[in-house]
Amino acid sequence: MWHNVGLTLLVFVATLLIVLLLMVCGWYFVWHLFLSKFKFLRELVGDTGSQEGDNEQPSGSEAEEDPSASPHKMRSARQRRPPVDDGH
């Protein structure tokens, strides 16, 4: 009888360990292949080591001083100017 209970507990614990291991491995691969590219998610997790998807300069003050350094930066909705209508 105790043999059956022990075997049942062993199978239960082994199943939990395998499921947890698969979840951790899945999260690791998804993080490194996709999620680490988003600066917002890196800030939430506190990961400063992986800078793969970050194309910004290390210090924000340098980027603010030279606006011509990033010509591809989109303006926010507040900064956009409506198109000029010439009346044609």
Curated annotation (Swiss-Prot):
GO cellular component terms, semicolon-separated: membrane
UniProt entry keywords in alphabetical sequence: Membrane, Phosphoprotein, Transmembrane, Transmembrane helix
Composition skew (Polar residues), residue ranges: 48-60
Stored Pfam families: DUF4750
Region (Disordered): 48-88
Membrane topology: Single-pass membrane protein
Residues recorded as bearing Phosphoserine in the entry: 59, 61, 70
The protein, known as: Small integral membrane protein 13
Gene source species: Rattus norvegicus
Taxonomic lineage: Eukaryota, Metazoa, Chordata, Craniata, Vertebrata
